[in-house]
């Protein structure tokens, strides 16, 4: 089934060439089925790359999805032109009176800053609080997951001695959770971060449950009971060459960076990267969309405030 995006969105052309079913607004107006409404709060600097990665995964679902793109109005973007944001994105003030089946809050390359020093932190707090009554299920990614765990549950983040950078094996802590349905016993996920949340802090919070972790990269999937909030510390949405682009960028700036682990054959950056996470990423987003949004959300979204 298609995902509905704003007319003319550049990601639509890219994904159409990949045979992802994209439906622009004009065509979607003639559909009789109520699509799922998903709002994506895109905090990444290069919004086009991130929105394309996420839409690719949402478009692999058999469900029809209506997309709203959101950006923090209190942050001035240096990497995405303002006219692009005006054309394709909404601000919180423009959507705060709406309700959504699902929400995705992306990561941001600011994990070394204290949360309170992030210029859009007050706005993000307001959006996260709003989501509790206006969104059925929210998926938090990487820094977004750290921000959500800190804001709602007081879970701190800690600096790492070296950047967690590479593709790491993960295992399941539960097998009877719908989000994990179909996951392999061992599956791989990219990570790219300078900070971490720790198991000993999360297990102290009765509302939270660690669903998956890694001996190398730590806690990966955390959920609230019932799945209204899902926290993902890795980047399963990454394209095959995203880690390469980050590595090449840091090398060009002469920044201290290790070769991403388990990514290049023989850890040799002259080789073509090996993708080990594509199946997992599609399953994670499909399960969230199906089991935690589509099958649970009320048909009348105005009922959300009562749940």
Curated annotation (Swiss-Prot):
One of its GO terms (cellular component) is cytoplasm. Coiled coil: none annotated. It catalyses: L-homoserine + acetyl-CoA = O-acetyl-L-homoserine + CoA. Substrate binds at residues 163, 192, 249. The keyword tRNA processing does not apply. Gene3D superfamilies: 3.40.50.880. GO terms for molecular function: homoserine O-acetyltransferase activity; homoserine O-succinyltransferase activity. It comes from the Bacteria. Keywords: Acyltransferase, Amino-acid biosynthesis, Cytoplasm, Methionine biosynthesis, Transferase. The record marks 111 as: Important for acyl-CoA specificity. The active site is at 142 (acyl-thioester intermediate), 235 (proton acceptor), 237. Pathway: Amino-acid biosynthesis; L-methionine biosynthesis via de novo pathway; O-acetyl-L-homoserine from L-homoserine: step 1/1. It holds the Pfam family HTS. One of its GO terms (biological process) is L-methionine biosynthetic process from homoserine via O-succinyl-L-homoserine and cystathionine. CDD domains: GATase1_HTS (cd03131). Its EC number is 2.3.1.31. Its main location: cytoplasm. The record marks 192 as: Important for substrate specificity. It is an enzyme of class 2 (transferase). It is found in: Cytoplasm. InterPro entries: Class_I_gatase-like, HST_MetA, MetA_family. Belongs to the MetA family. Transfers an acetyl group from acetyl-CoA to L-homoserine, forming acetyl-L-homoserine. HAMAP family: MetA_acyltransf. This is Homoserine O-acetyltransferase. It comes from Desulfitobacterium hafniense (strain DSM 10664 / DCB-2). The lineage of its organism: Bacteria, Bacillati, Bacillota, Clostridia, Eubacteriales.
